Regions:
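Class I S-adenosyl-L-methionine-dependent methyltransferase catalytic core
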Residues: 1-180
Length: 180
């Protein structure tokens, strides 16, 4: 039985991530999520992250499977600025837009929405339920027929309820990343 500690090998895989917020997803987690979703991702897709933060999930998506156009929206201006810088470090072209997803309009539809859903802080259960309802309504406006949503959420009950209530959605895969 041989055991080696490989702490002296430098790993620059996530060196693009120069900017981070307290709510930012760790790049290894983003890489895991897109890796799990890889069978559903298509090359030259038009992609959007409605709650992009600093862009980690989109950068990892573009790293795994090439995309045609990538759009990112967020209401937090600093996140947009940081995301632009991270994307530049990653040599990934992403169109960052400082706008609320629910107010976003675009000339064409997207093949994929990929996102880390906002976490419930002080919102009530009713407010979060309404948020997920609005998200799925707006997502339907932005997705092409046969488009997909890759979503990381800790509110699986709200997600499943919206899928159950809508004929245009179906759950293709569910993976528990962290079970507390």
């Amino acid at each position: 039985f041989v055991c080696m500690r490989l702490c002296s090998i430098q790993d620059n895989r996530f060196a693009y991530r120069k900017n981070v917020l307290p709510t930012s997803m760790h790049p290894s987690q983003a890489a895991l999520i897109v890796s799990l979703a890889k069978p559903y991702l298509k090359e030259t897709a038009q992609i959007m992250d409605p709650f992009c933060g600093v862009g980690t999930l989109l950068i990892e998506r573009a790293h795994l499977v090439p995309a045609r156009e990538i759009y990112a929206t967020d209401t937090y201006g600093d996140a947009i600025t940081m995301g632009r810088e991270n994307a530049a470090f990653a040599k990934t072209r992403i169109n960052f837009i400082h706008r609320d997803f629910f107010d976003f309009r675009h000339d064409y539809k997207f093949d994929e929405l990929i996102t880390d859903m906002p976490v419930r802080n002080r919102q009530t259960k009713a407010e979060m339920e309404l948020f997920y309802e609005r998200f799925f309504d707006k997502a339907a406006e932005h997705l092409v027929s046969g488009g997909i949503i890759v979503m990381y959420s800790n509110e699986i009950g709200f997600v499943k309820k919206q899928i159950r209530l809508r004929v245009e959605y179906r759950l293709l895969q569910e993976t528990c990343i962290l079970d507390k």
